Design a protein with these regions (language model features):
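Aromatic-anchored segments of alpha-helical transmembrane domains
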Residues: 22-29, 94-100, 166-178
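Membrane-helix interfacial "entry" motifs
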Residues: 5-9, 44-48, 52, 74, ...
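Hydrophobic, aromatic-rich transmembrane alpha-helices
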Residues: 65-77, 144-152
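N-terminal transmembrane-helix/juxtamembrane module of multi-pass inner/ER membrane proteins
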Residues: 1-69, 106-128
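Interfacial segments of alpha-helical transmembrane regions
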Residues: 69-103
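Transmembrane helix-loop junctions in multipass membrane proteins, especially transporters and channels
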Residues: 75-79, 107-115, 178, 182, ...
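Membrane-embedded catalytic cores of phosphoryl/pyrophosphoryl-handling enzymes
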Residues: 3-16, 122-208
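Alpha-helical membrane-inserting segments
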Residues: 27, 33-36, 66, 96, ...
Length: 208
């Protein structure tokens, strides 16, 4: 009964944040996205080094390496630390959230990315006509948000650190013109929600 009450409370809080996020995303989509994207498109000298250092392939490869290292450590030593276990699961949650976002949500919403918009594509939703190269929601922010959300749920002391890191990541997405502001906000919300939900489940599993 206590668990159900806690879950109901979490859902109510999440619903409030969902409505707030939807309002902010809608405003950004209509009023902010295009001017900001066009402004940063003119500082294209910043995009190349950012693309090289923070491409999704690089991040996914790093997370896969962490998972493999943890598995090998478990096989070699017979056990791993709680932190190591948390790190590996956070990486797995992050990768799963990224796959769902890129292959389901981006296809569903079909918003052209900033580069396509600059070259003539409209900044509109094209439902069920998207691809993994579409823009909404941001895969990078889903990737980072899911990892951060999982950690923040299990290690409350890390909340401030990850909030700062997510803000930095959001800034890099804008400066690099990878995504519109609405993409970033939606991706951060969805990713963090997925991470916190997974963290809730993992905490309940670990408490047994």
């Amino acid at each position: 009964m206590l668990i159900l009450n806690h879950f109901a409370f979490v859902i109510r809080i999440w619903s409030v944040w969902l409505v707030a996020c939807a309002v902010i995303v809608a405003f950004s989509f209509l009023r902010v996205d295009v001017p900001v994207a066009l402004y940063f498109w003119n500082v294209d000298h910043l995009r190349s080094p950012l693309n090289l250092a923070f491409g999704s392939t690089v991040i996914l490869s790093a997370e896969a390496a962490v998972i493999l290292f943890t598995v090998f450590a478990r096989l070699a030593r017979g056990h791993i630390s709680v932190f190591g276990e948390t790190l590996a699961v956070a990486c797995l949650v992050s990768m799963c959230a990224y796959v769902v976002n890129d292959h389901v949500l981006k296809v569903l919403f079909g918003v052209p990315n900033p580069a396509d918009m600059v070259h003539g594509a409209g900044h509109t939703f094209n439902f069920w006509m998207g691809s993994e190269n579409s823009s909404f929601p941001s895969g990078h922010m889903v990737l980072a948000g899911a990892f951060a959300g999982f950690f923040m749920r299990l290690y409350k002391a890390s909340i401030r650190l990850f909030c700062v890191l997510l803000l930095i990541a959001a800034g890099l997405m804008l400066v690099g013109d990878w995504h519109f502001l609405s993409d970033i906000i939606a991706g951060a919300f969805l990713g963090t929600s997925a991470g916190i939900l997974a963290g809730e489940g993992w905490a309940a599993h670990s408490a047994r």
